[in-house]
């Protein structure tokens, strides 16, 4: 690519001596060479810093920021985002491996498509022994796909995070213009919150190829803090659903078992809204006779027989009747 713009790659590392050499080497060996590599050592107590100092001697593009104390992942990430210089910034985890063409393929696409604010890719899975709950669902070499186009990504965000944070490359001007940060109020799912906000500022996209290898092991956030991550993700999902409902003219502050009662007649052709209602009926914070009667009167006809049976069975199991 001619006139290659500077890309800043930000890596946060805490006690990552086992993986950090391979991770940083995969960035150094990118086919795209105009890089600024910022590594935040978050008060590691193992040999992470020593490894970083040795590898930085081999490549002047590497800048090490070392926190005196462990400040946590979100704080460290925001420190890195506060001092990068590139036209684009990328994120990668200290235990993952970028394929050589990761940055070149995405930046080339972004340079040709000005309307896209940020772009990621599929992931290739690496499963290690004792890799926790998520690892049991995959095997090494599996490809973790996500929607490719903005509208499909936004629709998926109502129900889960369709963005692989460690593959994303974003335009710096949008990040700076809107003074974005990774929010500490959303621990263990801060990336889901961040990309939900970015999706309302510009177009997101995913490259249809696995450009980063994602390592599953027992010490990562999704394994150690799986319950907390799920609870935070549930909070973000409800915020995203509320935003969508407000956007289509349904005035609800927070979607829950009470506000669900404010949704009456629904356009059967709106597949997204039907999916939202089904999701909410299957995950109410409180199941009551009132909610059941509302479902039967207004929403029963929206769903097929299988979905209706699942919802009714959920009410039967969960309903709280005060005698």
Curated annotation (Swiss-Prot):
The domain of life is: Bacteria
What species is given as this protein's source?
Answer: Haemophilus influenzae (strain ATCC 51907 / DSM 11121 / KW20 / Rd)
Known EC number(s)?
Answer: 2.4.-.-
Any S-S bridges, and between which cysteines? none
The record's keywords, sorted A to Z, are: Glycosyltransferase, Transferase
Q: Which GO terms describe its molecular function?
A: glycosyltransferase activity
Q: Which N-terminal stretch is annotated as signal sequence?
A: none
The record's family statement is: Belongs to the glycosyltransferase 2 family.
InterPro entries, alphabetized: Glyco_trans_2-like (IPR001173), Glycosyltransf_2 (IPR050834), Nucleotide-diphossugar_trans (IPR029044)
Which protein is depicted? Uncharacterized glycosyltransferase HI_1578
